[in-house]
Regions:
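Hydrophobic transmembrane alpha-helices
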Residues: 1-60, 70
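Alpha-helical membrane-inserting segments
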Residues: 23, 27, 31, 48, ...
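Interfacial aromatic-anchored transmembrane helix boundaries in multi-pass membrane proteins
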Residues: 28-40, 65-99
Length: 187
């Protein structure tokens, strides 16, 4: 591959990563405020990794987190800053990166097939729930008082299971269609 082709591919990678970091931000702004805000962030993360693949998708999620950490209002409710990441629901936001990295690992181990992507999205969601709920319990205990696991799951996980399953199905459909339209070399 020529030097100009390599430079072009790197430039395209950077553009796609930036665009999909913005997609995640836009999805986070579509929000219904609850104890843990209902947003389309998980949808955005899953579409990002589904279209760009694990490596590029993980970079896009990292860029999204980095922008939010330095104060750019990319999180739910047009918020940003370390206070959000360290707050009660920050673990779910950090869990997005863990989800993307896990999806990348599953992709590396099992290849890029639709059923593998679906499986990795489910595993990614479980990891996000686990990190976010553990973080929520610790942050809530420091800020308000102790909270039991059953209560935390009732507030932070159970109400989101069905909507998140719907988001996974939609993310699979969108990822497959967008990947075909973009004709990306995802390997």
């Amino acid at each position: 591959m020529s030097t100009s082709a390599v430079a072009r591919n790197k430039t395209l990678d950077m553009v796609y990563i930036a665009l999909f970091a913005v997609l995640i931000a836009v999805c986070s702004w579509i929000s219904i405020p609850t104890t843990v805000p209902f947003t389309l962030q998980t949808f955005g993360v899953f579409v990002t990794v589904g279209v760009l693949g694990g490596k590029r998708g993980s970079f896009a999620v990292f860029i999204y987190l980095l922008l939010g950490a330095i104060g750019v209002p990319v999180f739910a409710g047009f918020t940003g800053g370390m206070g959000i990441l360290l707050g009660n629901t920050g673990g779910y936001i950090i869990g997005f990166l863990a989800s993307a990295l896990l999806m990348w690992l599953v992709e590396k181990l099992l290849g890029r097939k639709t059923w593998v992507l679906a499986l990795s999205m489910v595993f990614g969601l479980i990891v996000c729930y686990a990190i976010g709920t553990a973080w929520f319990m610790i942050a809530y205990a420091q800020n308000t008082g102790s909270i039991g696991l059953a209560t935390a799951l009732g507030w932070c996980v159970i109400p989101f299971i069905i909507p998140d399953i719907v988001k996974i199905v939609l993310a699979l459909v969108v990822s497959n269609r967008v990947s075909k339209l973009m004709k990306l070399n995802l390997n």
